[in-house]
């Protein structure tokens, strides 16, 4: 099992809409159960800080951006699908590759 990585995440929302609040609640649940406190989450309201959304080229909300560890990943839209979020954060793949029964093909050359 590889050592736990620290995740740095940004969640872009548009105000206190039901969709924004649902995204935040779902994400916090995932983070508390899967990341065990080894993360930093910054919530950015694009209505209050539009310059940050513009700098990061955010076109839709909610958008979850994983900044660290690389590579940078973005999940745009509904965050209620737990598996989709975990795959988007590369967490599900890492768990599968850490499993001794999992086979990962690294080289396709003959």
From Swiss-Prot:
<comment type="similarity">
    <text>Belongs to the KaiB family.</text>
</comment>
<dbReference type="InterPro" id="IPR036249">
    <property type="entry name" value="Thioredoxin-like_sf"/>
</dbReference>
<dbReference type="InterPro" id="IPR011649">
    <property type="entry name" value="KaiB_domain"/>
</dbReference>
<comment type="function">
    <text>Key component of the KaiABC oscillator complex, which constitutes the main circadian regulator in cyanobacteria. Complex composition changes during the circadian cycle to control KaiC phosphorylation. KaiA stimulates KaiC autophosphorylation, while KaiB sequesters KaiA, leading to KaiC autodephosphorylation. Phospho-Ser-431 KaiC accumulation triggers binding of KaiB to form the KaiB(6):KaiC(6) complex, leading to changes in output regulators CikA and SasA. KaiB switches to a thioredoxin-like fold (KaiB(fs)) when bound to KaiC.</text>
</comment>
<dbReference type="GO" id="GO:0007623">
    <property type="term" value="P:circadian rhythm"/>
</dbReference>
<keyword id="KW-0090">Biological rhythms</keyword>
<dbReference type="InterPro" id="IPR013474">
    <property type="entry name" value="Circ_KaiB"/>
</dbReference>
<dbReference type="InterPro" id="IPR039022">
    <property type="entry name" value="KaiB-like"/>
</dbReference>
<protein>
    <recommendedName>
        <fullName>Circadian clock oscillator protein KaiB</fullName>
    </recommendedName>
</protein>
<dbReference type="Pfam" id="PF07689">
    <property type="entry name" value="KaiB"/>
</dbReference>
<comment type="function">
    <text>A metamorphic protein which reversibly switches between an inactive tetrameric fold and a rare, thioredoxin-like monomeric fold (KaiB(fs)). KaiB(fs) binds phospho-KaiC, KaiA and CikA. KaiA and CikA compete for binding to KaiB(fs), and KaiB(fs) and SasA compete for binding to KaiC, thus the clock oscillator and output signal pathway are tightly coupled.</text>
</comment>
<comment type="subunit">
    <text>The KaiABC complex composition changes during the circadian cycle to control KaiC phosphorylation. Complexes KaiC(6), KaiA(2-4):KaiC(6), KaiB(6):KaiC(6) and KaiC(6):KaiB(6):KaiA(12) are among the most important forms, many form cooperatively. Undergoes a major conformational rearrangment; in the free state forms homotetramers as a dimer of dimers. When bound to the CI domain of KaiC switches to a monomeric thioredoxin-fold (KaiB(fs)). KaiB(fs) binds CikA, leading it to dephosphorylate phospho-RpaA.</text>
</comment>
């Amino acid at each position: 099992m590889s050592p736990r990585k620290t995740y740095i995440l940004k969640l872009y929302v548009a105000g206190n809409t039901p969709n924004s609040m649902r995204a935040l609640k779902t994400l916090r649940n995932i983070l508390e159960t899967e990341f065990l406190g080894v993360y930093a989450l910054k919530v950015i309201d694009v209505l209050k800080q539009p310059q940050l959304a513009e700098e990061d080229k955010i076109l839709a909300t909610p958008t979850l951006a994983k900044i660290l560890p690389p590579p940078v990943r973005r999940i745009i839209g509904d965050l209620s699908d737990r598996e989709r979020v975990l795959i988007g954060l590369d967490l599900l793949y890492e768990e599968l590759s850490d499993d001794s029964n999992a086979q990962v093909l690294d080289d396709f050359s003959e």
